[in-house]
Structures are given as C-alpha cells and as structure tokens.
Regions:
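C-terminal beta-sandwich/jelly-roll accessory domains of carbohydrate-active enzymes
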Residues: 60-184
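Aromatic/acidic polysaccharide-binding cleft in carbohydrate-active enzymes
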Residues: 1-77
Length: 184
C-alpha cells in the first residue's frame, strides 16, 4: 500500500475503499466477467469474444508510470496520483466486425476517469477530507460506469469508432436478439 488505509481513498490496491465504495478496478472486473471463453481476436488494446450470437468487444487504453520504481515516492501524492504518467494522448480506434446481417442491440459500458471512478469523482468534488454519510452516498450514486444503448442494422459488417482517454476500459456487448442480453 502507498498510503494509510484509514482514510477515504487511502491508496490500497483493493476493489473497494474502506467505506465499501466501488473503485474503478471493481467495475473493470465486472466488464472482464462479461467476456466469453471463445476468443475471436485480440490485439494490443482490445479483445473480441463470442458466445452464440453475442459478441463482447473490450477496448482498453492503459498507461504505466514513468520511472515508477525510481520516482514513485516523489511523484505520487494523495490527491495527484496521475502526475507520474506524463501527458498521454487519447487513443482512436476503428474496429470492423464481420457479423451476419441482421438487427443488433449494442450496450457500451465505460470505466474511465470520468465514468465509474469514485476516486476521480471525489477529486472533482474538491477531495473533501470529511467522509460524511452524505458525501459517501453522493459518491456511491454518481460513480457507476456510464452505459449507452444503441441499435444497428448490419449488412456484412459493423464499424465501431471509439476514442479512448487514457486509463479507460470500454466494453461493447453486441447481441442479435436484444431480449437475451445479460443484465449487470
């Protein structure tokens, strides 16, 4: 652990903070759990899986600290944990999926610094040190991942254009029959 575990967002590596708030890593594990065992394709920033007529496309833009071991104590602070990454641009991706022609429902779930990150929401609130029930409730209610639903009519292929900010994971679930998509 980098910071004491006795305060809000103390820096521990767990999936929940000391008050039970779900960290971004928790939601990322939920996304990973939606992937099927049948891997169709994978690359540096994506993995595509399939289960029957359902497809799962996981896109990710991760970053690693600059000189992590050498500079960690001097760079990393309680409220400025991202400084050690430097300036990393967004990642634009265009994925072409060869799918059977038909009507599809897509569910896109994003975990990033602006969606699904209780820590980043807390920073946006001014990093209040007093962890009142009101503050904790607000963070719990507002820090879940954004979910977008879209419909698409496919003729041979589906084009997915996505821009990923650094530290983001996007899961796009694609189902030919909308009524059998899993609820998470």
């Amino acid at each position: 652990d980098f910071f004491p575990e006795n305060r809000l967002f103390g820096g521990g590596p767990g999936l929940l903070d000391i008050h039970g708030l779900k960290k971004a890593s928790y939601y990322t594990f939920v996304q990973l759990n939606q992937l099927s065992n049948s891997i169709l394709s994978k690359g540096e920033h994506y993995i595509l899986t399939k289960n029957g007529s359902h497809y799962q496309l996981l896109l990710f833009h991760t970053a690693f600290p600059l000189d992590y071991d050498e500079h960690l104590p001097s760079i990393l602070s309680y409220e400025q944990r991202y400084d050690c990454y430097g300036n990393i641009p967004t990642l634009s991706m265009c994925i072409i999926l060869n799918l059977p022609s038909g009507h599809y429902l897509m569910r896109q779930t994003e975990v990033s610094r602006t969606s699904g990150s209780a820590y980043d929401l807390w920073l946006k609130m001014g990093a209040p040190q007093y962890d009142s029930v009101e503050i904790l409730d607000h963070i719990q209610q507002k820090s879940s991942p954004d979910t977008i639903y879209r419909e698409a009519t496919v003729t041979d292929h589906l084009i997915i254009d996505v821009t990923l900010p650094v530290h983001s994971v996007i899961l796009i679930e694609i189902a030919e029959e909308p009524n059998i998509m899993n609820n998470t």
